[in-house]
Curated annotation (Swiss-Prot):
Its main location: secreted. Expressed by the skin glands. Disulfide bonds join 18-24. Antibacterial activity against Gram-positive bacterium S.aureus and Gram-negative bacterium E.coli. Has activity against C.albicans. One of its GO terms (biological process) is defense response to fungus. GO terms for cellular component: extracellular region. It comes from Lithobates pipiens (Northern leopard frog). This is Brevinin-1Pd. InterPro entries: Antimicrobial_frog_1. Pfam families: Antimicrobial_1. Belongs to the frog skin active peptide (FSAP) family. Brevinin subfamily.
């Protein structure tokens, strides 16, 4: 498991959550 993958996954999840909750 690479820290880079975790960072990218967290970034993607944040964008998705932002879009869904509309709390950017």
């Amino acid at each position: 498991f690479l820290p880079i993958i975790a960072s990218v996954a967290a970034n993607v999840f944040s964008k998705i959550f932002c879009a869904i909750s509309k709390k950017c």
